[in-house]
Amino acid sequence: MFFVTPAYAEEAPAAATGTDAHAAPAAGEVHTETGVAEGGHARGPFPPFDSTTYASQLLWLVITFGVFYLLMQKVIAPRIGAILDQRHTRLSQDVEEAGRLKAEADAAVRTYEGELAAARAKSNAIGSAARDAAKAKAEQDRRAVEATLSEKIKAAEVRIGEIKAKAFADVGAIAEETAAAVIDQLIGGTVAKADVAAAVAAAKKEV
């Protein structure tokens, strides 16, 4: 930014006047030179480096910085602060929501695990009761079958004893008759029936 001071403003017309004096020759004069006069542009230092303009430059610098500072303080900084506060509030809400959802998920997991453990315990109890009932029923059926078989075995043993006794009785009579016939054929005589019965009885005892 360039600043025009009164000193530079006074020098500018003088330079312009000097230029006009060179540009407008008197009547009747003929100039054959084609060079450009630069004396007017060489007067004075470059405005930003002119020591006479330092005060005004510092003043405008302070004014510009003050305006920029007020703009930052009144407009930009509040907007940035509001955005940061909004983001902080949003993050806090998101963190709270995440914590709430995590707590609900943990509670749901604990409830599920509790229900699963209860279901397993109930299933084990039902299985154990079913096994015990089946075992008791099987034991009862086994005992009933054993009792029935025992009764049948006893009845069969009695029947076998009766058949055996009858068979032995019949065998004894047949043996006596057969022995009498054999003796009669061998020695050609008869033997007393009591002797034959005694011999058969002795043979039965040996068997």
Curated annotation (Swiss-Prot):
It is a single-pass membrane protein. The chain crosses the membrane at residues 58-78. One of its GO terms (cellular component) is proton-transporting ATP synthase complex. Keywords: ATP synthesis, Cell inner membrane, Cell membrane, CF(0), Hydrogen ion transport, Ion transport, Membrane, Transmembrane, Transmembrane helix, Transport. InterPro entries: ATP_synth_b/b'su_bac/chlpt (IPR002146). It is found in: Cell inner membrane. Its main location: membrane. One of its GO terms (molecular function) is proton-transporting ATP synthase activity, rotational mechanism. Coiled coil: none annotated. F(1)F(0) ATP synthase produces ATP from ADP in the presence of a proton or sodium gradient. F-type ATPases consist of two structural domains, F(1) containing the extramembraneous catalytic core and F(0) containing the membrane proton channel, linked together by a central stalk and a peripheral stalk. During catalysis, ATP synthesis in the catalytic domain of F(1) is coupled via a rotary mechanism of the central stalk subunits to proton translocation. Component of the F(0) channel, it forms part of the peripheral stalk, linking F(1) to F(0). The b'-subunit is a diverged and duplicated form of b found in plants and photosynthetic bacteria. F-type ATPases have 2 components, F(1) - the catalytic core - and F(0) - the membrane proton channel. F(1) has five subunits: alpha(3), beta(3), gamma(1), delta(1), epsilon(1). F(0) has three main subunits: a(1), b(2) and c(10-14). The alpha and beta chains form an alternating ring which encloses part of the gamma chain. F(1) is attached to F(0) by a central stalk formed by the gamma and epsilon chains, while a peripheral stalk is formed by the delta and b chains. Belongs to the ATPase B chain family. HAMAP family: ATP_synth_b_bprime. This is ATP synthase subunit b 2.
